[in-house]
Swiss-Prot record:
L-glutamine binds at D67, Y212. Pfam families: tRNA-synt_1c (PF00749), tRNA-synt_1c_C (PF03950), tRNA-synt_1c_C2 (PF20974). Residues 317-324 are annotated as: Interaction with tRNA. It catalyses: tRNA(Gln) + L-glutamine + ATP = L-glutaminyl-tRNA(Gln) + AMP + diphosphate. The keyword Protein biosynthesis applies. It comes from Shigella dysenteriae serotype 1 (strain Sd197). The lineage of its organism: Bacteria, Pseudomonadati, Pseudomonadota, Gammaproteobacteria, Enterobacterales. This is Glutamine--tRNA ligase. GO terms for cellular component: cytosol. A motif ('KMSKS' region) lies at residues 268-272. One of its GO terms (molecular function) is glutamine-tRNA ligase activity. Monomer. Its EC number is 6.1.1.18. Gene3D superfamilies: Glutamyl-trna Synthetase, Domain 2 (1.10.1160.10), Glutamyl-tRNA Synthetase, Domain 3 (3.90.800.10), HUPs (3.40.50.620), Ribosomal Protein L25, Chain P (2.40.240.10). The keyword Cytoplasm applies.
Length: 554
């Protein structure tokens, strides 16, 4: 497959191909412009993969630019987190990290240019009055009484704003466009507002800050962006994007193109709702493994490759749609099935004693991956007392049950065939110990007499077991579209986190955060980066071996 054939195809790439073929552009320059007021989520990953991926494929450039125009909500913590997420996903920005605040002097000069052209004015309506005057989708707006101020009036008033002569909310700079426009965004939008807040990049130099719609297009032009890619909610804003660039003296006029944002089942993407989950302690933080944040997915065990593959599969369109959670889960499941070494862990343990087993124990050889001999093998201790999962034993069962049953045989993974002889129970009737016998001639081979033993279960030697905490993470919400609920918090899945105390094979004591394993017959797990200790490792379930929600949705 050629490089061109391997590239994804979508309407944006078709536009770029046409622009390059026609000579409109000789190179491609994109940007990823997050606001540093929160953590990136899987929706941002789509934009990252699109913008950086296009730059890679066309041998162009992609800038990382922080839209840092609201110092009240922004923090250097988010700047650092976003940079880390972009790099973790496997991308590298062109040149230095950029900030919209780098252009505050130029933006201020362009605002003065608009004032001098009679295209901007200082308004002293209150924010509430501005909203009232703006009108609705069915009702046109009305002009502010300050709209017809002269250039000679507006220039000193704007300077008064800049030097702190107005209180917050007492004045703003607005574009002078059309209060009767069918597009509300064009009804004299605010260009600058007053905020007495220290900025994480510029300190206290400024007390006026430009709005996103004024900043975004000028920053694109100053950086030579050729294709400014936004999600569909900014479609109407394109008119303002073009209006600003058409009315200032700037040599470059980028074009904005919109694509559908990512909507994913069983979660929410709204920053406000995600923040509520964190602040109300429904989750333990922005990196909670149930969160759709990149940091949460990473802590859960998702790989950068699986997220890139997911973004590739869902594609880029102009049609809003909701993606099944199963699509994301299948990407990580396929990745880890191929690449994760195998290990054994018992999540709900019950003791099993092999009464005729002689000696202290032995080592059995196990492949690290059943289909990849190049991944090698490991030695796992075996002994006469082991832990098995409680779900792998029944006193009575039908023929469909292929695990251990009283009076019947089963194979222990890569070890011996055993037969359940009797059980011991506590006062409440719970099985505490299963007593078995084993066939000593069946170590990793079939019984000599030819009898068939169909079931295979995993196990951990009790004498060598590593005590572990196992966190069974599941979907955070119990309905596909929690955002549509009257109270999205009311549909949080009460089983989204189940904590178990289990045992694992001793090799897992050397596990490191970010390294995934398939716990045989259980699912894919990784060491938790926050709660694990040397004395008590904590493993997070990344995803099960199969989609257990499939039947729920039918």
């Amino acid at each position: 497959m050629s490089e061109a054939e391997a590239r994804p195809t979508n309407f944006i790439r078709q536009i770029i191909d046409e622009d390059l073929a026609s000579g409109k552009h000789t190179t491609v320059h994109t940007r990823f412009p997050p606001e540093p007021n929160g953590y990136l989520h899987i929706g941002h990953a789509k934009s990252i993969c699109l913008n950086f991926g296009i730059a890679q494929d066309y041998k162009g450039q992609c800038n990382l630019r922080f839209d840092d125009t609201n110092p009240v909500k922004e923090d250097i913590e988010y700047v650092d987190s976003i940079k880390n997420d972009v790099e973790w996903l496997g991308f590298h920005w062109s040149g230095n990290v950029r900030y919209s605040s780098d252009y505050f002097d130029q933006l201020h000069a362009y605002a003065i240019e608009l004032i001098n052209k009679g295209l901007a004015y200082v308004d002293e309506l209150t924010p509430e009055q501005i909203r009232e005057y703006r009108g609705t989708l069915t009702k046109p707006g009305k002009n502010s009484p300050y709209r017809d101020r002269s250039v000679e009036e507006n220039l000193p008033l704007f300077e008064k704003m800049r030097t702190g002569g107005f209180e917050e909310g007492k004045a703003c700079l607005r574009a002078k466009i059309d209060m009767a426009s069918p597009f509300i965004v064009m009804r004299d939008p605010v260009l600058y507002r007053i905020k007495f807040a220290e900025h994480h990049q510029t300190g206290n130099k400024w007390c006026i800050y430009p709005m996103y719609d004024f900043t975004h297009c000028i920053s694109d032009a100053l950086e030579g962006i050729t294709h400014s890619l936004c999600t569909l909610e900014f479609q109407d804003n394109r008119r303002l994007y073009d209006w600003v660039l058409d009315n200032i003296t700037i040599p470059v006029h980028p074009r904005q193109y919109e694509f559908s944002r990512l909507n994913l089942e069983y979660t929410v993407m709204s920053k406000r709702k995600l923040n509520l989950l964190v602040t109300d302690k429904h989750v333990e933080g922005w990196d909670d493994p149930r969160m759709p944040t990149i940091s949460g997915l990473r802590r859960r065990g998702y790989t950068a490759a699986s997220i890139r593959e997911f973004c590739k599969r869902i594609g880029v369109t102009k049609q809003d749609n909701t993606i099944e959670m199963a699509s994301l889960e299948s990407c990580i499941r396929e990745d880890l099935n191929e690449n994760a070494p195998r290990a054994m862990a018992v999540i709900d343990p019950v003791k099993l004693v092999i009464e005729n087993y002689q000696g202290e124990g032995e080592m059995v050889t196990m492949p690290n991956h059943p289909n990849k001999p190049e991944m090698g093998s490991r030695q796992v201790p075996f002994s006469g007392e082991i832990w098995i999962d409680r779900a792998d034993f029944r006193e009575e069962a039908n023929k469909q049950y292929k695990r251990l049953v009283l009076g019947k045989e089963v194979r222990l993974r890569n070890a011996y065939v055993i037969k359940a002889e009797r059980v011991e129970k506590d006062a409440e009737g719970n099985i505490t110990t299963i007593f078995c016998t084993y066939d000593a001639d069946t170590l990793s081979k079939d019984p000599a007499d030819g009898r068939k033993v169909k079931g295979v279960i995993h196990w951990v030697s009790a004498a060598h077991a590593l005590p572990v905490e196992i966190r069974l993470y599941d979907r955070l919400f119990s309905v596909p579209n929690p955002g549509a609920a009257d109270d999205f918090l009311s549909v949080i899945n009460p089983e989204s986190l189940v904590i178990k105390q289990g045992f694992a094979e001793p090799s897992l004591k050397d596990a490191v955060a970010g390294k995934a394993f398939q716990f045989e017959r259980e699912g894919y797990f990784c060491l938790d980066s926050r709660h694990s200790t040397a004395e008590k490792p904590v493993f997070n379930r990344t995803v099960g071996l199969r989609d257990t929600w499939a039947k729920v949705g039918e």
